[in-house]
Each structure stands twice: as C-alpha cells, then as structure tokens.
Swiss-Prot record:
This is Dual-action ribosomal maturation protein DarP. Residues 184-200 have a biased composition (Acidic residues). The gene is darP. Residues 1-25, 177-200 are annotated as: Disordered. SUPFAM superfamilies: PSPTO4464-like (SSF158710). GO terms for cellular component: cytosol. It comes from Burkholderia ambifaria (strain MC40-6).
Amino acid sequence: MTRKTRIQPIEHAAEVDDNGYDRPSKSQLKREMHELQVLGQALVDLPKDALKRMPMPESLSDAVREARRITDHEGKRRQLQYVGRVMRTLTDDETAALRTALDAQRGVNKAATARLHWIERTRDQLLANDDALTEFLRQHPDADIQEGRTLIRNARKEAQQGKPPRYFRELFQWIKTASGTPGGDDEAADEAGDDHDDEA
C-alpha cells in the first residue's frame, strides 16, 4: 500500500538575510545582547549629572540607579544582567538615542581632559621657563600679568621649600581663567597639585 504525501506550499519569509535564513542566528542575537549589556554597564558607570541627561525610559533609569547603589559583587552582577534585560525591551530608536548621547558624553569628557592636560603642560612650561610667560601673555592679552608673575614666583619658591602646593594650584586656576576655560574643575586642579606633592 502506497502512502500519498501531501505537499505543503512553501511560504517565503518577508525578510531573508544573506545566508537565506528568515531570522537572526543565535550568534547574532548573543552579540546584540552583549552589546546591550556593555551599553548598560556604560550607563551605570556614568557620573550622576551625565546620567540625568541620558534619554532613558523610567524602567531603565530605575534599574541603572539600583545597579549604582548595590555594592555587593554578585548582587551588582545580577542587577547588571537585569539592566541588560530591560535594555532588550527598548526600541531601536531608543537604543540609538542612548548610544548617541553616550558618544556625545564621551566626546565632552575627552575634550575636557585634553583641555586640563593643556593647562597642566602650560603651567609646567611657565614654571620652567620665563620666556613661556611672554608667549602665554601674547596669546592671552587679557590675562593679569602681575598676578601671573606673582603666582609663578610663589609656586617656584614653595616647590624649592617643599611646602604644600597652594600657589601651584592657584597658577592652574589663573591659566584656566586667563585662557577662557570655564570653572568647575577644582578636583582636577587638586589632583594636578597632588602630582606636584609627589615631585617635590
């Protein structure tokens, strides 16, 4: 007895990838999940004020804030996995907006860091060479010449005597103000002053 088999018509998938599959591979899904996990970790690592500016839905914001609060290693790991799970519920547009905002934040940080390094190099040049002040004043004619000379002289003196770097830090602030850099980087100035402690 022969059996008749019924042939079903093949329906073509709406979208087919390069390999002929109609859905993403497991490897592709894993890569995407890992990317979202990394993005979530980047959000958790952001400074508090930068985190407030991120375009996040409330559920993700709550999960990220909770991950920042947890200090236990295993608890934090689990919470970060939860952040990744919440991120998988976001639309592509929401994820793209988050990536754009994070890239912009990283760009701002790089520019600010480069600016602080320039100020530190300028300070070192001013302390090492008297001609550097003339060049600095040529580039920044609105700078207070007398204050600059006084700070340089006092910073050199305190370095020779091994005193705390008060004028060293004030010179940093003077350069920042004279060159038109906005304030608010006192911590960086303090760190730069601490470097001086090690050298002295």
